[in-house]
Amino acid sequence: MYGSRRLWQENGGISTYRDLLYVCSPTERNRIIHFLSTLPDHFDVEVGDRKFHLVHAMPSDDPDDRIWRRPKPDDPPYFEDRIAVVGHTPTCYMSGDMESPFAVWHGNGLIDIDCGCGNKTELRRLACLRLDDLKEFYI
């Protein structure tokens, strides 16, 4: 767990940690931490006739992998019966396109929606994927 905490802090979590420590009251901090500890790190959903596996980073049985690992564009499908929808890995690394505004990437049973919103590049944007029809929206 220490490794995950360190990674989280190095990836921008330190400002959240400071806010929890210095801005929130102990009661508020405990409520937030309790709430976050009850959330799943992945879940399966069915929309229309499609099934999806939604996960932050990578489909896996290992909880650390679900938060920190990065899929590769040529990975075989993770599931036979559902599409994995991931973030964490900016889509430019999946597409190899470092010159265009980041766009949702569609692979073999995998969709990456991380369009770099948290990065500093001018090409970043927030993406939303409507699961009903896979229509993409950008801000």
Regions found by a protein language model. Give the residues of each.
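Active-site-proximal segments of metal-dependent phosphoesterases and phosphodiesterases across multiple
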Residues: 2-5, 10, 57-78
